[in-house]
Amino acid sequence: MKGMHGIIFSYGEKPGLGQLTANRIHGSLPFGGDYRVVDFILSNMVNAGITDVGVIMHGKCQSMLDHLGTGKSWDLSRKTGGLKLLPAFAYSESRGVVGAFRGKMEALGCVIEYLRHIRQDYVVLSDSDLVTNLPLTRVLEAHIASGADMTCVCTSHPGESGDTYFKLDNTGRIVDTAYDIRTPEGYQSLNIFLLGRDLLLELVEDCMAHDRYSFRHNVLQDKGKELRFNGYVWDGFAARINSVQGYYQRSMELLRPEIRAELFCPQRPVYAKENDAASTYIDPSGECVNSLISDGCDIQGSIRNCILFRGVRVEKGAHVENSILFKNTVVRSGAS
């Protein structure tokens, strides 16, 4: 069956996010007022015509399970296929691993039977911590046209030293993969990979047979000369949420009209869990300047350059600037 199948990884801890992920895995982190981080890559997949998506989870999954539910908000609640939540444990435990997976290949090994029943010819692998609006159909077109074994989405925008970086030749082929380098150079990987279903199964089964677990090391680096891996350069807005500071900076960028226009373009809408909150009330004496405000808020004070999630209440006489207020936060009168 032609088309693409989506696999999203949402497991492991990100120490840089601190208390933001104390009770959740990073994919369910609230972002932009109405969304969770996972909504963006999930919407990218749906907008590309992907109707089957598996989400591999491990750890504090309750928030993610509650948010995704049956997948109805993304039109993925289906009798055949649709959204599958995959809290996988068996393979890692059989290798004596306690806690998080050692790597993506081990996580995929946990759901090997699921992979064997994929109906589509191509599979898109992605982390859940990326905020972007990527036209995956273009990635597929480039992948087929190039004849590559795997296409890796990357960007020329600078990242962090711990990220993965690719060097490309003039044909777009990845000739070197490096990570944990002091001075990053090349193209930063966005951790979105497109490859054939049969090749994916072959790679996973080979790693399982040899107790290998790292996608970055055992696939990107070890197989780079044997197979053809191409880079697809995407220089649109792309934010990987890895730290509290990064979360704040990337969130506040949403207050820029050009960023909102790119991220929330009507051609590729971003879907989120439906809610039935009442409309936001802004008192005649209240002040709202350059802010994103979700439904169900009560604004009687002053807010400037802020992002408000649902149910936030700002009492009369309160002044809030340059802040992100999470769900049901109350700012008392006189606070500033």
Label each residue range with its predicted role.
Residues M1-E253:
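Unchanged
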